[in-house]
């Protein structure tokens, strides 16, 4: 029997009746509360350890209960009962020790609360005033933050001033939801109305002044000024409105662009961030090299690398310095070689301006260097800069850009429009952060490749250096650059360098694994989201895999750190929210509940922006000049250079040319016994499937040369499932940026695979068939935890893994699917359609065929059990073919222009995220 023992006050009245006979209560000053399980005439078992709840924290059960909806004057309200505590009994110490006075009772009152769920535009605008002093206190904040998704500034002002045009003509109303609740204590209804409107307009001017930047006439702001002059003459609001109008009129020549561009001028002052902006800023790096000659002679830390001489010849070969690669994927990704790449993490975006800076940056490197002293050829190498300095400078750049992000530009309804004609000006502050992300990733790829004379051990030292930089970024809680570095190290052009990774130290690789786990796509990137929640506003990072010195350093110095998140997570969340929830309910009522959900994400962004003010980092001109001057490599250039450094083997080339998949079979056989043909001897790093997220260890140079892994498209800000596909030997297809738009993805692009239905990028480690052979360092322990999983081309127990591709002529994409002995053909076809983003199609319109040879295919009967109907002696390669007798619409290839169907991934949503 179990009895909860609370310490009672003196006297019999203070105790509780025993639940069971034979139980007894006990109290300890140290334990406060104990549980005893006992039986008569037996020794009780006492539970001494338990998790104590802070009595000051809210109770686990929800204090709010929704009971229904009400329709009042054209507005739908969500009705809920909220329990509010009226009296706090006893102090915290008394409650903790169990001595709380029984007379001190916790009294609660149940209140009926209305919150706007949906309504017409007129009613939503009208509700601003009563909500200001009503119970829906957050309504005004949410409305001002999200109204751009369903109306314009001019419409809101027109409706607001029409409804409350003359304060002196307003009659009071006591009914909630009409005009404005008031009390005699605060003056009459007219005074309260003036105060409410003044507060609403004042908040609007202070927090969203860019809404009124409409040069050259500024009609909205002038309309507001006229209203204030008439109804609130001499008020502080009138003064602020006149001041803002004067400022905008004086800055008109500079800001004569669409209102969404207003934040752009604020991005210009910081020279370190110039490369992250539009091409127009590319020339700015030219003056920057001025300080570069000074740094060149003082490479104190440069002793770390023996490749220092390499930079000189590198000037003409572009690979050696480092440039902004254009996008980076998640920990399990293999970003394709360079600026216009398509790999990206869970929440990725496409940046139109990104390619433009390429031509402008390339010429800027030689010219400024030559213009300086004879030191021009002594360009500093990456290893001249200590990892902590590099991480700090990246953090400074990222934090400045993130603080300038206009939060509502992240809304899915705005960000998803950026690629449309005439919308190129949208969200410039977000584009700047994307460009910076791509620049960091490109810098990593270029420096790791070095030039043609760089040896594998030297490249390994550079890789180790970047891993240390990533670790320092983690300490600084800079998740943006951390993600960019990890993604670049997992890019196709880097991860295929088998010899380079063989020389990477065990400790560095272990750190790399730990850091990569942060961005695991498992459960909608739950780990990175939890970290962001845990450390978002904390003073220091909570690290486990770092040395003790790294743990103590921030605390010893007393430096409080901010947090720079990976913005793609939030963009994904908001785009997914925009897709998942309807804009209108019951035909014409604006779904304001959707705006509440969006504001929850926006509020997180604002909170983290304020946390960025905690950083106190001084810019380093030498590093800034070096970083801005780094030359960009295109996707093809970085891939070709990688192939020159470590040429692909002939066997791999033949395999790719014939598009045979037998190599996959052997590659998976390596999981049980290393093969001399597919792997070399020797091993130092063994790891589990989860650890295989580290891109470079996923495959050897032989096969990975022609394989590419990518993820999320930005138009949907969704994360595509990572798949490995046979593609031409070199990425000659259209170059793509890291945060490529999913709507532009197609099988024609090397390594492009369609978005997964689960909307989370599936790492190669979690899709066994997608994994490629590892090199000699990792073959022995390739996947300890996967021994129970079925191997490709082999039926294990009652399940197997098959690969299903679409019946198209412009690519050979496939999706790996787990088939059990219970799966019928329609279920397998539906799985394949979901993987290929064909959710809108019907399974009845498709048929499943097994490819036995180049000229033979086995058709799986409509209702057959695929596990038993398939030919188990042939390759487990299938094709999803549209039936000829149906009037089907054009089959979607690659990623869909719309977001894939969401499954239960936390709102999955959100990309994120976080």
Swiss-Prot record:
Disulfide bond sites: none
InterPro entries found in the cross-reference section: RA_dom, RalGDS_RA, Ras-like_GEF, Ras-like_Gua-exchang_fac_N, Ras_G-nucl-exch_fac_CS, Ras_GEF_dom_sf, RASGEF_cat_dom, RASGEF_cat_dom_sf
Biased composition (Low complexity): 304-338, 675-686, 745-772
Domain of life: Eukaryota
One GO term describing the cellular component: plasma membrane
Posttranslational modification: Phosphorylation of Tyr-814 by MET blocks HRAS binding.
Amino acid composition bias (Pro residues), ranges on this chain: 282-300
GO BP of this protein: Ras protein signal transduction
Region of interest: Disordered: 280-365, 666-689, 728-776
Residues with PTM Phosphotyrosine: 814
SMART domains, per the entry: RA, RasGEF, RasGEFN
SUPFAM superfamilies per the UniProt record, alphabetical: Ras GEF, Ubiquitin-like
Gene3D superfamilies: Phosphatidylinositol 3-kinase Catalytic Subunit, Chain A, domain 1, Ras guanine-nucleotide exchange factors catalytic domain, Son of sevenless (SoS) protein Chain: S domain 1
Assembly and oligomerization: Interacts with RIT1 and RIT2. Interacts with OOG1. Interacts with TRAF3. Interacts with HRAS.
Function, as annotated: Functions as a guanine nucleotide exchange factor (GEF) activating either RalA or RalB GTPases and plays an important role in intracellular transport. Interacts and acts as an effector molecule for R-Ras, H-Ras, K-Ras, and Rap. During bacterial clearance, recognizes 'Lys-33'-linked polyubiquitinated TRAF3 and subsequently mediates assembly of the exocyst complex.
Name recorded for this polypeptide: Ral guanine nucleotide dissociation stimulator
Species per Swiss-Prot/TrEMBL record: Homo sapiens (Human)
């Amino acid at each position: 029997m179990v009895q909860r023992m609370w310490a009672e006050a003196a006297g019999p009245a203070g105790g509780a009746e025993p639940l069971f006979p034979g139980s007894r209560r006990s109290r300890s000053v140290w334990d406060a509360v104990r549980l005893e399980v006992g039986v008569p005439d037996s020794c009780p078992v006492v539970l001494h350890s338990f998790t104590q709840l802070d009595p000051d924290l809210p109770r686990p059960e929800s204090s709010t209960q929704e009971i229904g909806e009400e329709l009042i004057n054209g507005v739908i309200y969500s009705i809920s009962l909220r329990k509010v505590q009226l009296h706090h009994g006893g102090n915290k110490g008394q409650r903790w020790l169990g001595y709380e006075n029984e007379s001190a009772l916790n009294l609660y009152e149940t209140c009926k609360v209305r919150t706007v769920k949906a309504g017409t535009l007129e009613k939503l605008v009208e509700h601003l005033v009563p909500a200001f002093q009503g119970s829906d206190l957050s309504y005004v904040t949410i409305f001002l933050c999200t109204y751009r998704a369903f109306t314009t500034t001019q419409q809101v002002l027109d409706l607001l001033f029409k409804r409350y045009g003359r304060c002196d003509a307003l009659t009071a109303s006591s009914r909630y939801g009409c005009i404005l609740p008031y009390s005699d204590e605060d003056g009459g209804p007219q005074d309260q109305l003036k105060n409410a409107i003044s507060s609403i307009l004042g908040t609007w001017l202070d927090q969203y002044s860019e809404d009124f930047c409409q040069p050259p006439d500024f009609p909205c702001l002038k309309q507001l000024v006229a209203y204030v002059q008439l109804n609130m003459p001499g008020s502080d609001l009138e003064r602020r409105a006149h001041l803002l109008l004067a400022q905008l009129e004086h800055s008109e020549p500079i800001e004569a662009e669409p209102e969404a561009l207003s934040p752009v001028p604020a991005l210009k002052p910081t020279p370190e961030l110039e490369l992250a902006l539009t091409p127009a800023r590319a020339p700015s790096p030219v003056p920057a090299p001025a300080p570069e000659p000074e740094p060149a002679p003082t490479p104190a830390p440069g002793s770390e690398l023996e490749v220092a001489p390499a930079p000189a010849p590198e000037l003409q070969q572009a690979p050696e310095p480092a440039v902004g690669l254009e996008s980076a994927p998640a920990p399990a990704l293999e970003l394709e070689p360079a600026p216009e790449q398509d790999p990206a993490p869970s929440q990725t975006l496409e940046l139109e301006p990104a390619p433009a800076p390429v031509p402008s940056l390339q010429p800027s490197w030689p010219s400024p260097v030559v213009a300086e002293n004879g030191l021009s050829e002594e360009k500093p190498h990456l290893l001249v800069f200590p990892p902590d300095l590099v991480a700090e400078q990246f953090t400074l750049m990222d934090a400045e850009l993130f603080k300038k992000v206009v939060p509502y530009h992240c809304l899915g309804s705005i960000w998803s429009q950026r690629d449309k004609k005439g919308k190129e000006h949208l969200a410039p502050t977000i584009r700047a952060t994307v460009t910076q992300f791509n620049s960091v990733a490109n810098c990593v790829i270029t420096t790791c490749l070095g030039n043609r004379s760089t040896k594998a051990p030297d490249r390994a030292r550079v890789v180790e250096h970047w891993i240390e930089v990533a670790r320092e970024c983690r300490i600084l809680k800079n998740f943006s650059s951390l993600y960019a570095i990890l993604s670049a190290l997992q890019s196709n052009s880097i991860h295929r360098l088998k010899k380079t990774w063989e020389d990477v130290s065990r400790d560095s690789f272990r750190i790399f694994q730990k850091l990569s786990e942060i961005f695991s796509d498992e459960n909608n990137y739950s780990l990175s989201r939890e970290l962001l929640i845990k450390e978002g506003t904390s003073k220091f990072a909570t690290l486990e895999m770092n040395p003790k010195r790294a743990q103590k350093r921030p605390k010893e110095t007393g430096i409080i750190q901010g947090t720079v998140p990976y913005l793609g997570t939030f963009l994904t969340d908001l785009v997914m929210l925009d897709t998942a929830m309807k804009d209108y309910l019951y035909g014409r009522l604006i779904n304001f509940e959707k705006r509440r959900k969006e504001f929850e994400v926006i509020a997180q962004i604002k909170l983290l922006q304020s946390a960025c003010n905690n950083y106190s980092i001084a810019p380093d001109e030498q590093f800034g000049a070096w970083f801005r001057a780094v030359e960009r490599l295109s996707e093809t250039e970085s891939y070709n250079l990688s192939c020159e450094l470590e040429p692909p083997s002939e066997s791999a080339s033949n395999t790719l040319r014939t598009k045979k998949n037998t190599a996959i079979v052997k590659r998976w056989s390596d999981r049980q016994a290393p093969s001399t043909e597919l792997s070399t001897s020797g091993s130092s790093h063994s790891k589990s499937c989860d650890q295989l997220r580290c891109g470079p260890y996923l495959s050897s140079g032989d096969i990975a040369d022609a394989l590419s892994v990518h993820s999320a498209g930005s138009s949907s800000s969704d994360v595509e499932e990572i798949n490995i596909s046979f593609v031409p030997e070199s990425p000659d297809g259209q170059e793509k940026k890291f945060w490529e738009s999913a709507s532009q993805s197609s099988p024609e692009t090397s390594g492009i695979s369609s978005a997964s239905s689960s909307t989370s990028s599936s790492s190669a480690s979690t899709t066994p068939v997608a994994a490629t052979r590892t090199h000699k360092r990792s073959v022995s322990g390739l996947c300890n935890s996967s021994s129970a999983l079925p191997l490709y081309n082999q039926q294990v127990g009652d399940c197997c893994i098959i690969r299903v591709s679409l019946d198209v002529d412009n690519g050979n994409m496939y999706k790996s699917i787990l088939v059990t002995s219970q799966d019928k053909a329609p279920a397998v076809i539906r799985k394949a359609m979901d993987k290929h983003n064909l959710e809108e199609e019907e399974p009845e319109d498709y048929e499943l065929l097994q490819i036995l040879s180049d000229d033979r295919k086995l058709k799986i009967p409509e209702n057959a059990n695929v596990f038993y109907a398939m030919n188990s002696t042939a390759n487990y390669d299938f094709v999803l073919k549209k039936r000829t007798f149906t009037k089907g619409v054009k089959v979607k290839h690659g990623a869909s222009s719309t977001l894939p169907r969401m499954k239960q991934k936390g709102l999955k949503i959100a990309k994120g995220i976080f």
